[in-house]
Each structure stands twice: as structure tokens, then as C-alpha cells.
Amino acid sequence: MMTLASNKRKLYYAEYLANVPEYVVDDDGNRVISYITDDGTVIYAQTGEKKPVYSTPQEMYVNYAESGGEAEAKEFGLSVADYEAILLYGAGEYHLKESFLVWADSQIEYEYGGEEIEVEVDGETIKTKAPVKTSADFVVLKTPRSLNFERAILKAITK
């Protein structure tokens, strides 16, 4: 199934990377330096807590429909009251997964003043601008697939 380009809307998505230590930040949102090692490596102060970190948001063009409501119908194993929107896109076009973030109308905000940070995921170091989770409009609940197209079922994030 092809989706019409004229029906597509530009949205942004970010992949969940990992739970990482939370850094101490100053009044401007920049990380506070704890110390610098002899070889010049900067070590930032940590709060002792962990929080989820997401990849730098990427744009996507998808069919977007707000839905949900009070009906008792169930689709994809969810009541329509459990989700607020659905994305539809061609098979293999995007690789959205559960817990990804999606921005439809809100401005993307970044942790640490937009400074790029490094996150280690499965032994690989990934650089990200670390978007703020609550700046996103939705989180992906499910991604049912079919032969020619894929869907992403979205739940609104409380702001």
C-alpha cells in the first residue's frame, strides 16, 4: 500500500537509547564540571539518579491521525481510549519502536543547553543532543506491521 505524499505531515522522532546518570546542571542548563583528568578528559558532576536519554530527533513524513476517545472498541490490543494518535507509513520507511518519542506540534527542547553528550549503548558510543522527554507530544505504544505499511500507535505525554 502506498501512502499519498500530499497526505503526509512532517513530524520528528527520537529513539530511546538508555537510562544514564543524571548530571548536575547550572542555571543555564549546562552540565557542571566535577574535575578534569590529567589527560584532559572532562568529568561532569552527577546527581546519583538515572534518567532515560533519547537520540537527536530526526524528521519523518507520515500520515498522522489523531484518534482515541471513549468508545470500547479495541484495536491492536488497546482500547481506543488508551491512545491519542496513529502514524501510518510505508513498510521499512522508518524503524519506530515502542518507547520512541514523537513531536507533532510542540517545539523540541534539549537537556544540557542543547550540548551534545555521549551515551554508551551496547558497547557503542552514541552522540546525542538529548531531547527532553516532556517536550515531546507522544510516546510510541505499539508498532503493528503488515506487508506494505506500518503503524505507530501513540500515547500523549502529559505536560
Annotated model-derived regions:
Residues 3, 25, 30-31, 36-159:
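Short, conserved turn/kink motifs that form compact alpha/beta structural patches or helix kinks used as
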Residues 1-20, 159:
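Short, intrinsically disordered N-terminal pre-domain segments
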